[in-house]
From Swiss-Prot:
GO terms of molecular function: ferrochelatase activity; metal ion binding
GO-annotated biological processes: heme biosynthetic process
NCBIfam families found in the cross-reference section: hemH
EC number: 4.98.1.1
Encoding gene per record: hemH
CDD domains, per the entry: Ferrochelatase_C, Ferrochelatase_N
Cellular compartments annotated: Cytoplasm
Binding site for Fe cation: 196, 277
Pfam families: Ferrochelatase
Involved pathway(s): Porphyrin-containing compound metabolism; protoheme biosynthesis; protoheme from protoporphyrin-IX: step 1/1
Name under which the protein is recorded: Ferrochelatase
Taxonomic lineage of the native organism: Bacteria, Bacillati, Cyanobacteriota, Cyanophyceae, Oscillatoriophycideae
Domain of life the protein comes from: Bacteria
Function according to Swiss-Prot or TrEMBL: Catalyzes the ferrous insertion into protoporphyrin IX.
Length: 387
């Protein structure tokens, strides 16, 4: 019988305060998180952002105990899935591949090769597909597979997304129902779905299906819930000056409060494990915001973690994937290429394309010089008294 492995993919998170800065550097070094026209800028910009943000981020992690519980929860999920599969008659080895912190995806692949796995199911712990979550991990795996002859011997299949799985939806409905039942006025509770946001350009220009899958998921949950409570979908955790999917969670909370909502139940729709965005951003920041805005009762649905209905459904999903035709990384990477076409000789401003390329390069050099001067406090702008 073939040796079967299950590779669970997730984001990763700093386990202690000292991990925060390198974790942020890894995160912002990913071109799917911050997309730049020049790849050589990725690492310097990641260093700059992680240097500027890590102290604030450390403060946030202090508020939830000094580190992320994501690794330990993912390990619990892996064990629960393995036990469920064993009950269904399938013996497997479980592996965890985090994108930005230990155990890194590369570490998981080293174990997979060492333990001579012959069949591998790759399961992202993101219900909805996005080029910045599952897609980023799939592209990394694709690159690693291409240059490793040992990996090429492994028969693998990829599960791109599973946002409409019946067990996932049912588990979410059960958790929402439990919270509604604890409210003194369950019919008056406004159900507030909060998903991690992505830049609008990912959806409109790169063809990311994330927003559509989130909306489909919310619609399916509400239909299964079969209640008359009003509901809202909003997006949290945006970074940087570009436009992200709207409405933003903080704006939507204030708008609902201004409209007279007093009971709010927040449902973290794109997260299956407790981590910084549920424990700190929702439980602390958004709770304070809601109370200041006039919301009297703020509730939050817990993350799925090892909910038995959810775990059983993931085990079924693995079994189905093994029986179905295999899907490779190219099938799973759902991103269309957008190519902006310009005249070959001149752009609309009358400049040659070569001149525009050099203008762009010089602009980026100037940008990096400005960043360096802001960080060090030395340079021509300081000398001239402009900074």
């Amino acid at each position: 019988m073939s040796r079967v492995g299950i590779l669970l993919l997730n984001l990763g998170g700093p386990e202690q305060l000292e991990d925060v800065r390198p974790f942020l550097f890894n995160l912002f070094s990913d071109p799917e998180i911050i997309r730049l026209p020049f790849p050589w800028l990725q690492k310097p910009l990641a260093w700059f952002i992680s240097t500027m943000r890590f102290q604030k981020s450390q403060e946030n992690y202090k508020e939830i105990g000094g580190g992320s519980p994501l690794r330990s929860i993912t390990e619990e999920q892996a064990l629960a899935i393995q036990q469920q599969l064993e009950q269904k008659g399938l013996l497997t080895q479980m592996y965890i591949g985090m994108r930005y912190w230990h155990p890194f995806t590369e570490e998981a692949l080293t174990r997979i090769k060492r333990e001579q796995v012959e069949k591998l199911v790759i399961l992202p712990l993101y219900p909805q597909y996005s080029i910045s979550t599952s897609g980023s991990s799939f592209r990394l795996l694709d690159k690693l597979w291409e240059k490793d002859s040992e990996l090429k011997k492994i028969e693998y299949t990829v599960i791109p997304s599973w946002h409409q799985r019946p067990g996932y939806v049912q588990a979410m409905v059960e958790l929402i129902t439990q919270q509604l039942d604890q409210s003194p006025n369950p019919d008056q509770v406004h159900i507030f779905f909060s998903a991690h946001g992505v830049p609008v350009s990912y959806v409109e220009e790169a063809g990311d299906p994330y927003q559509a899958e989130i909306e489909e998921c919310v619609d399916k949950i509400m239909k299964t819930l079969n209640c008359s409570n009003p509901h809202t979908l909003a997006y949290q955790s945006r970074v940087g000056p570009v436009e992200w999917l709207k409405p933003y969670t903080e704006d939507a909370i204030e708008e609902l409060a201004a409209g007279g909502v007093k009971d709010l139940l927040v449902v973290p729709i794109s997260f299956v494990s407790e981590h910084i965005e549920t424990l700190q951003e929702i439980d602390i920041e958004y709770r304070e915001l809601a109370e200041e805005a006039g919301i009297s009762n703020f509730y939050r649905v817990p993350a799925l973690n090892t909910h038995p209905v959810f775990i059983n459904d993931l085990a079924d999903l693995v079994m189905e994937a093994l029986d179905a035709p295999s899907r490779d990384f190219s099938d799973a990477i759902q991103m269309k290429k957008i190519i902006k076409m310009y005249p070959q000789e001149r752009w609309q401003w009358g400049l040659t394309t070569t001149a525009e390329v050099w203008n762009g390069r010089l602009a980026m050099v100037g940008f990096m010089a400005l960043l360096l001067e802001l960080i060090t406090g030395y340079g021509p702008l300081h000398f001239a008294g402009l900074l």
